[in-house]
Amino acid sequence: MVKTNILSNHFLVAMPQLNDFTFTKAVIYVSQHDAKGALGIIINRPLALTLGKVLEHLNIEIAQPQIANHPVLMGGPIGQEHGFIVYEQESPQGAEILLSASKDMLDDIAKNKGPDDFLITLGYAGWEAGQLENEIARNDWLVVPFNRKILFETPLKSRWQKAAALIGVDINQLSGQIGHA
């Protein structure tokens, strides 16, 4: 059994045999993991929606025209009517990755006063107590240490392969028929 909280600030990389439409080839940033369950955001599933359309819908004026084309991601199957901003913030302990649902932060981003690096998502992935640990034991997920470049700089289409490569795995070489030793 995986200790609780150990998966916070890690990536989950879907194994090739995971055939659930939502999670096929998904990379998830785990924001929170404790005895009650886990919460994560899929970071490589773009929607047919841009930040410009979201800001227009919210009547927020864009001061930075180039952010209008920033992709909006499907963060997960739960609460897809809710948006999240995934961003980095410096703290006395170092850089932290935070989630926000603040309209004020969206306004700051539109005015070029927000974080330099951010993701905009709709929805999230959630697991009840013990559910994620069982999925990991079933070989549904690789657990990969957090890497800021994967989260903010790697092209969306490359994140699945690049995240697995962080732990020396060529995900394309894995069989969909993985068993237990």
Swiss-Prot record:
Cystine pairings recorded for this chain: none
GO cellular component, one term: cytosol
Gene3D superfamilies: VC0467-like
Coiled-coil intervals: none
InterPro entries noted in UniProt: AlgH-like
Pfam family, one: DUF179
PANTHER family linked to this entry: UNCHARACTERIZED PROTEIN YQGE (PTHR30327), UPF0301 PROTEIN YQGE (PTHR30327:SF1)
Family that this chain belongs to: Belongs to the UPF0301 (AlgH) family.
NCBIfam families associated with the record: PRK00228.1-1
Protein's UniProt name: UPF0301 protein CBUD_2193
Taxon lineage: Bacteria, Pseudomonadati, Pseudomonadota, Gammaproteobacteria, Legionellales
